[in-house]
């Protein structure tokens, strides 16, 4: 099926002005540097989104100014020449066939993103010239996207058949193929580690312009995506989509091995490492590997001895915030989860589940070396040190090493009785 040609509008070119937001000189002066940087990033991203539709869009003066690292033109574009973007210029486009099909949503987002920069502005529509912004049910706040369906309903993307013949951009590192050269360049940054987009506020670097745009919202305080159910706001649409599944209960990502379902793909990926045994995050200090980056981060603290999360009530410190939150329930609330067998109560469901295995005799964690099974993963980990000879707990007084924390605590009690603290000094 042949691709449908773009809407005629007297066969005129779709210009950048059709989706541009302009500022007066006074409005521009009121923007702080980080807002100007966000405006620049969004304008470039918007222009490239239109280019991705495959239409011969002229290159306006405002884009030329940005490319030269200059200030943007303030009101209007002062007679931009109608010339197409040269094919030799590499654009940083997030373009896939499926996203081309969603071009209407992309152009609607152009107006939504720009609406947060300045309260007074002109909005160029796709159906005519400049018109003042009107408050409608779909545009009451800057957090709601404007409805531009009327001017967009005729616009169509090139057919997939026309696009597939261009899928000849292959990564030399991993063999993955892409539909355009710019997508290949962006992908290759995952191998090279290149991050060409710097935040002017804090200096943090990013590999994608869209990631920089999202990050800049942290500095401006903008959270444009709001949950209708609870009012919580997010910096990007994907985070809002994942959050809304908490309210709907939808878990579209299912594990093929055990059938467990998850709200997002990243949680499924982390879970699947339990089945595959993959541990991609390795400690450079001791060589120990972990399935999740957060676990490695927490593990690194055991080498420094630093426990950054301290309880305000009793002063006890912890390596992770989840451990602190679990501990603080001791001070603030009663244990809610009670064992029906023995009456013992717990603060969280996972602790109760672990405890109930004592009564059921369930031992799902089996040692690969000797076949011995355990009811808890931590007990299996402790047991495996018998085979590996690992002794990660070292006494700060005498240097003796132990395979379990309980053993070193028992050992250090001897020094406590002698009046020697854990640092080795007399109290």
Curated annotation (Swiss-Prot):
InterPro entries: KRAB (IPR001909), KRAB_dom_sf (IPR036051), Znf_C2H2-type (IPR050758), Znf_C2H2_sf (IPR036236), Znf_C2H2_type (IPR013087). GO terms for biological process: regulation of DNA-templated transcription. Its main location: nucleus. One of its GO terms (cellular component) is nucleus. A zinc finger (C2H2-type) spans 169-191, 197-219, 225-247, 253-275, 281-303, 309-331, 337-359, 365-387, 393-415. This is Zinc finger protein 2. Belongs to the krueppel C2H2-type zinc-finger protein family. Keywords: DNA-binding, Metal-binding, Nucleus, Repeat, Transcription, Transcription regulation, Zinc, Zinc-finger. The keyword Zinc applies. It comes from Mus musculus (Mouse). GO terms for molecular function: DNA binding; zinc ion binding. Residues 14-85 form the KRAB domain. It holds the Pfam family zf-H2C2_2. Signal peptide: none annotated. It is found in: Nucleus. May be involved in transcriptional regulation. Residues 111-142 are annotated as: Disordered. It comes from the Eukaryota.
